[in-house]
Amino acid sequence: MALQDGTLGEPVSIDRLSDLMLRLQGKGAHNINLVTPTPHRDAVLAALKQAKKDGLSIPILYNTGSYESVETIRSYEGLIDLYLPDLKYRDDRLAKRFSKAEGYFSVAIDAISEMIRQVGFMQLDESGLAVRGVRIRHLVLPGCVFDTRAILDAVAERFGTDCPLSLMSQYTPIPECKDPALSRRLTQREYDSAVEYCLSLGFTDVFTQGLDSVGTSYTPPFHDRIDL
């Protein structure tokens, strides 16, 4: 499956995708990570069902920006063990400006609600590996701590403060981004303010990051090829 611009990746059949999942399991993978699989939903569903029939038993992780319909998420029920949804924006003006995502928040919060209905909050095994459930991720953006606070308020109201969170600080400006608001990194003061507000609300399970997480090392090496 190629990336959106069509310059990377390769087409694979349903049988091949199913086989790749089984090969990853055979090589010791902890889970199968489906990153934004929505454009290929029908093929992914078919491949998952085939792989599970043929012995796939490691957790299946669904990694998403959450701009998805409840119907789409519901179609994966019983197949997905772990959901890692982003909750990017509370203010729809930011969603439209930065991501061209009209009505982002209402769509995303309903999709996440369906994920939680299916698998609950994230659970870890005895070795500390996630095996089931949901952890909501939020990337704190420069100049947008006010929106982070609104996101945290909304999560606390909708899901309670036991909802697992990941507050990320890794925003990295790239030359292709022309919006001046996103031309700089997050400051320590901004991130600390976001974390302090999160804790003041009483959230009990929060992953945080140091600002040393900023940089291109967090950008996946899309050009690397792994032979399976």
Task: List each model region and its residues.
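Anionic-ligand binding region
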Residues: K96-S127
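Conserved Radical SAM active-site core
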Residues: M1-L82, D91-R93
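Alpha-helix N-cap and loop-to-helix initiation/capping positions
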Residues: V12, P39, S99-V107, G143, ...
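Conserved radical SAM core fold
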Residues: L3-Q4, R41, S66-S69, L87-F105, ...
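A cross-family glycoside hydrolase active-site/sugar-binding cleft signature
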Residues: N33-P37, L61-G65, D86, R135-L139, ...
